[in-house]
């Protein structure tokens, strides 16, 4: 059997990251184009520290990519964009992913909402 999707551990991490409504909104917004933290926070209507926490979680799951860039006035700005991914869940892909789990009961580190 050839593994075509993410490993079990990566799938758990991706799905856990997307299980939060705010993180799902962030990915949906970034799917329309890259953006920097301050603008994204204003657009979504959350504080920068809260947004940053969620961006870190999405980046750790491999769903978004962040890059530091200099603005015209020399200010460092972190831009985020959606990472290329294609997630299709079927019984077969779930079975393949489950077979690669590093433990029978993975613990997902989640901050309280």
List each language-model region with its residue ranges.
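Long, low-complexity, charged/polar intrinsically disordered regions in eukaryotic proteins
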Residues: 1-7
